[in-house]
């Protein structure tokens, strides 16, 4: 004979947690989109699947760490520099060479080759300033967040086949379904038309026929469709 505790547990609505039930809860059934369902890998997590398919799992910015792909980690050797090398100063020859690289064949400076925030001074034969050319070339900010840089790089990548299939699936022509009025709605609109004609303000104030208090605009749209279906000319 079972004890009082065992009998109470048998009658309880809370069942014992078993491994079999837990595995059923962990199984994910992807049925939202046929293209994603076809390319889904059940051995990967949601974030890993979205990244593999070229999609974004979360629209909000990251709040924590990100899984590192060890297959793409490149081990770089430590650069060895001379202790007497001067990083702060730059020779006039190198500066002149950089300025010549930014200049075109006719001596004019190309703003697209000059980094943003810098400028080049163009002088004439006498050394007088002729023009100041400001650079427009975008540079990478070292203080910028790494996540923002990764996001910019991911946006420049070529779209995956799954993304291309989803875009073509979303841009397919969709036939618009025509809504037809039911027999009860047609009967109700007919009674309103017999009583009020095309006076929609009176229809809206009729508490006996307009029991759901449809607005003037809603009644006008319904009545316009009803008049067209019954081949009745609408009063201008």
Swiss-Prot record:
Q: Which controlled-vocabulary keywords does the entry list?
A: Nucleus, Ribonucleoprotein, Ribosome biogenesis, rRNA processing
Q: What does this protein do?
A: Involved in the biogenesis of the 60S ribosomal subunit.
Example GO BP: rRNA processing
Residues spanning the signal sequence: none
Name of protein: Nucleolar protein 16
Q: Which domain of life is it from?
A: Eukaryota
* Cited InterPro entries: Ribosome_biogenesis_Nop16
| Chain segments carrying region Disordered | 1-23, 89-118
**What interactions and quaternary structure are annotated?**
Component of the pre-66S ribosomal particle.
Any one GO CC term of this protein is: preribosome, large subunit precursor
Underlying gene: NOP16
Family, similarity comment: Belongs to the NOP16 family.
Task: Please tell me the species this chain comes from.
Answer: Eremothecium gossypii (strain ATCC 10895 / CBS 109.51 / FGSC 9923 / NRRL Y-1056)
Please verify whether the record's keywords include Nucleus.
Answer: yes
Localization, UniProt: Nucleus, Nucleolus
């Amino acid at each position: 004979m079972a004890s009082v505790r065992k009998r109470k547990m048998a009658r309880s609505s809370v069942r014992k947690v078993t491994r079999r039930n837990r595995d059923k809860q962990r199984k994910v059934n992807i049925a939202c989109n046929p293209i994603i369902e076809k390319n889904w890998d059940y051995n990967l997590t949601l974030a890993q699947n979205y990244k593999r398919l070229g999609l974004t799992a979360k629209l909000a910015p990251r709040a924590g760490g990100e899984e590192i792909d060890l297959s793409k980690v490149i081990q770089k050797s430590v650069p060895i520099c001379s202790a007497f090398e001067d990083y702060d100063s730059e020779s006039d020859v190198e500066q002149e060479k950089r300025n010549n690289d930014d200049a075109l064949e006719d001596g004019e400076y190309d703003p697209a080759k000059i980094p943003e925030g810098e400028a080049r001074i163009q002088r004439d034969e006498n050394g007088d300033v002729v023009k100041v050319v400001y650079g427009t070339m975008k540079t990478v900010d070292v203080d910028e967040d790494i996540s923002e840089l990764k996001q910019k790089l991911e946006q420049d990548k070529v779209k995956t086949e799954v993304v291309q299939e989803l875009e073509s699936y979303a841009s397919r022509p969709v036939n618009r379904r025509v809504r037809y009025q039911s027999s009860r709605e047609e009967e109700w609109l007919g009674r309103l038309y017999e009583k009020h004609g095309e006076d929609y303000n009176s229809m809206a104030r009729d508490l006996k026929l307009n029991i759901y208090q449809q607005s003037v605009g809603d009644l006008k749209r319904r009545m316009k469709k009803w008049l067209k279906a019954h081949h009745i000319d609408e009063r201008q």
